[in-house]
Amino acid sequence: MTVLERLDRVGKKLLATGNGRCNLTNRNAAPEHYHSADTARLADILERTPPDAVLDFFGEMGLLCDTQADGRVYPYCYQASMVLDVLRAALERAGVDVACSCGVAEVEKGPGGFSVRTRDGRAFSAARVVLAAGGQAGPQFGTDGSAFALARMLGHSVAEPYPCLVPLRCAGFPVGLKGVRANCALSLYLDGRCAGTERGEVQFAEYGLSGIPAMQLSCLLGPGVKKAGTSVDFFPEMAFPVLRGMLEQRCASGMFASLETLLLGLVAKKLGHAILKSCGLQPLSRAPGSLSRREVNALASALKNWRFAVEGTLPWTQAQVTGGGVPLAEVKT
């Protein structure tokens, strides 16, 4: 058995997984947690290789693991470098040859097996070939998308790749929100229809939205999407009439001297000011009691449905995974 590694050392990208901690698997792995049109094939794969099988695989190599409350599994030492060391040691014990700086240029299937030619002219032959070259996400770690050309050589079709688990670029995004975080519900609209909603901590940036909810929804932004937008609900567990009533009470209470403090205790200060401005509620020195019912209604609407047009995502360097590629239906299980 021989491993052909295009880079000068194996496992370079592995060191970056899980923010350097290496998320090995998830105890809650299930088809509904994946983005795929072929859920039947996905279910079959997960049934054949459940999380316990993954943990047994690493356990047999001597790696002790730790499972978090949300089901994520990491090496007990929480160091990706340890996972790489364990894998390299297993290769050595099994007598596997590893050829680094050995990028593959061509692969061809013939009557007697496969022939492989590298970029520097070396030739290899094998009864079986495993193409495990990754996609295009994180090119700074060595991935360049060249594996898709090899897949085509073997007769596979390749759907147009696109960045996934990546922050969203939003048009007309308010300035000054960089670094602000909020627990909320984030929805993605594609061509006017809600394509998905994720709840959790959203991070506001100078370009748009980040955080787990935004990155999860980015997987729905495939090629061909003509119009996309987001909706931020800062109070997903509170019905609109209840929120509006609370705002009306705050305006009438006299507790808040100006709009500058009206949303104090509800959302972050910078966020509150940006929302008020988006509703045209200026200046901030204005007395809350002067707001009309229509203006209070507009403010409540913004807190429940703050909308932004999505221009796209950040580039491949910020993406964690690749969408598209070889269809799951063409992968034998």
For each predicted feature, which ranges?
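Short hydrophobic core segments
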Residues: 2-4, 104, 123-143, 151-152, ...
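General beta-strand structural signal in soluble alpha/beta enzymes
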Residues: 3-5, 67, 98-100, 131, ...
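Conserved N-terminal/central alpha/beta ligand/cofactor-binding core
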Residues: 6-97, 102
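An anion/pyrophosphate-binding glycine-rich loop and adjacent beta-alpha core
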Residues: 8-10, 15-16, 24-31, 64, ...
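A glycine-rich dinucleotide-binding beta-alpha-beta segment and adjacent secondary-structure elements
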Residues: 100, 273-333
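A conserved short coil-to-beta-strand element within the FAD-binding core of flavoproteins
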Residues: 100-113
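Glycine-centered tight beta-turn/hairpin loop motif at sheet-sheet or coil-to-beta transitions
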Residues: 119-121, 193
